[in-house]
């Protein structure tokens, strides 16, 4: 009887979904291609149902926000953003997850995060991307590097220089690698890290060059421990973006998050910077 009822259930599922969602091999179930197609939508429906229950049943009690940030954003902005959020919504419980753009994108697609603020490019058409906060990369040189006392550098002078760079999957690395390809540069990757602070230390103490967000170096620029060079052609200008799933149920916390991000929109630039020339 158990085998018969299981068989009838399989027939029903095949008819209802126009095909099987699972294949049974021995004692294990495996997703079919049709099942894999349904899975992210099912996860999002479950997540939306949980959020609706929270709104309806827990009025006046704490709400939650699972917020993703890429490493640059997580280092220089996320702590302040969370403080601002909790001032506006005192009972908000925020879970913060910081990693590179590639990992954040996958977590949003699997409904493991409610929203994220990223610096890199998002590729999935299932995610809504709202560019909000101005940012730019700059070339950084420490006091012991020959570039430190220069006012202008030509792009071709970057050839054969030792660089400290971010890991694969980073939006910062992708932007810089695209730049080196456009200008046919052959740099020497001597230091690779997923920590902006580790890259900055390589610049300060190991005579490396690095390209990173100017927002990460306000203290070092003020104290003249690094010299930064802006990209004359604006090729390193970018936006930090609010990202969430297109089917996401937008909670009051997400709406408030968007408002807060606009208060960080403008970029503070130092009065004195070097220039990286293109021609």
Residue ranges and their predicted role:
Residues 100-105, 109-113, 118-119, 175-228:
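Hydrophobic hinge/microswitch elements
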Residues 147-148, 161-183, 214, 250-258, ...:
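Secondary-structure junction motif
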């Amino acid at each position: 009887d158990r085998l018969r009822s299981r068989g009838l259930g399989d027939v029903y599922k095949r008819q209802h979904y126009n095909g099987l969602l699972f294949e049974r091999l021995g004692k294990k179930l495996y997703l079919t291609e049709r099942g894999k197609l349904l899975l992210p939508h099912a996860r999002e429906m479950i997540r939306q149902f949980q959020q609706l229950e929270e709104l309806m049943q827990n009025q006046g009690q704490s709400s939650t926000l699972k917020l993703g940030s890429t490493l640059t954003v997580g280092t220089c902005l996320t702590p302040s953003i969370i403080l601002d959020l909790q001032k506006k919504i005192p009972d908000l419980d925020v879970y913060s997850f910081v990693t590179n753009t590639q990992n954040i994108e996958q977590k949003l697609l699997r409904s493991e995060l409610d929203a994220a603020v990223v610096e890199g490019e998002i590729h999935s058409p299932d995610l809504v991307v709202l560019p909000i906060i101005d940012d730019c990369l700059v070339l950084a040189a420490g006091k012991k590097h020959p570039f430190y006392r220069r006012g202008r550098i030509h792009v071709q002078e970057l050839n054969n220089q030792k660089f400290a760079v971010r890991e694969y999957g980073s939006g910062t690395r992708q932007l810089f690698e695209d730049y080196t390809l456009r200008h046919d540069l052959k740099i020497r990757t001597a230091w690779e890290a997923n920590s902006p602070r580790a890259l900055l230390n390589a610049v300060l103490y190991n005579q490396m060059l690095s390209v990173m967000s100017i927002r990460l170096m306000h203290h070092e620029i003020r104290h003249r421990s690094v010299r930064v060079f802006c990209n004359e052609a604006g090729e390193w200008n970018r936006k930090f973006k609010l990202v969430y799933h297109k089917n996401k149920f937008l909670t009051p916390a997400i709406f408030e998050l968007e408002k807060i991000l606009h208060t960080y929109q403008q970029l503070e630039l130092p009065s004195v910077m070097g220039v990286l020339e293109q021609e």
